[in-house]
């Protein structure tokens, strides 16, 4: 794990903010909220709730609760948050399947982060098998690599179901390019 003194780098992924005018959280204000929690080297990426920060805390569950509490206090929103160490995220990318994250413009590559306590088996049993000719999935740790045809995405099994009320609240999704950028920050 990248450690500076006793500090470790983490990524917080907020679910469902700044989408179609709902759950508005300005990134500059979010950054200040993280800094008030005594997190250091706070950076945000895009407007979709990607925050990179350093903390001396080892327990991602504690970090998650702190961040969710700050968001509730500062923005009066109940936002699911997924916290992961940068080291773990690097390991995930190093273990990506060969078919995921290449430069094929016909394919859309995503990484699905599964919010604890949900597990891959919960997600899979809720959504079902992918349509093999249109999409691929592979689970690893607390994520699912998911790729699908850009032109036929509406025909995939996972596209509409990842946003369903039952399972959608247990997931947050980022593109391959976004995840790579976050790791490099």
Where is each model-derived feature located?
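Surface-exposed, charge/polar-rich loops and edge strands
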Residues: 7-48, 52-185
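Short, Lys/Arg-enriched N-terminal segments with co-localized hydrophobic residues
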Residues: 1-6
């Amino acid at each position: 794990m990248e450690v500076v003194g006793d500090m470790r780098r983490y990524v917080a992924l907020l679910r469902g903010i700044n989408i179609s005018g709902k759950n508005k959280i300005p990134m500059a204000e979010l950054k200040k909220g993280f800094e008030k929690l005594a997190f250091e080297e706070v950076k945000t990426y895009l407007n979709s709730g990607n925050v990179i920060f350093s903390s001396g805390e080892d327990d991602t569950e504690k970090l998650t609760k702190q961040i969710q509490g700050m968001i509730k206090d500062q923005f009066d929103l109940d936002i699911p948050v997924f916290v992961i160490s940068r080291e773990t995220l690097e390991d995930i990318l190093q273990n990506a399947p060969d078919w995921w994250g290449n430069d094929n413009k016909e394919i859309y590559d995503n990484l699905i982060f599964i919010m604890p306590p949900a597990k891959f088996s919960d997600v899979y049993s809720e959504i079902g098998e992918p349509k093999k000719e249109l999409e691929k999935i592979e689970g690893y740790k607390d994520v699912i690599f998911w790729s699908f045809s850009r032109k036929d995405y509406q025909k995939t099994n996972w596209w509409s179901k990842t946003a369903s009320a039952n399972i959608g609240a247990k997931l947050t999704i980022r593109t391959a390019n976004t995840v790579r950028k976050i790791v490099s920050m």
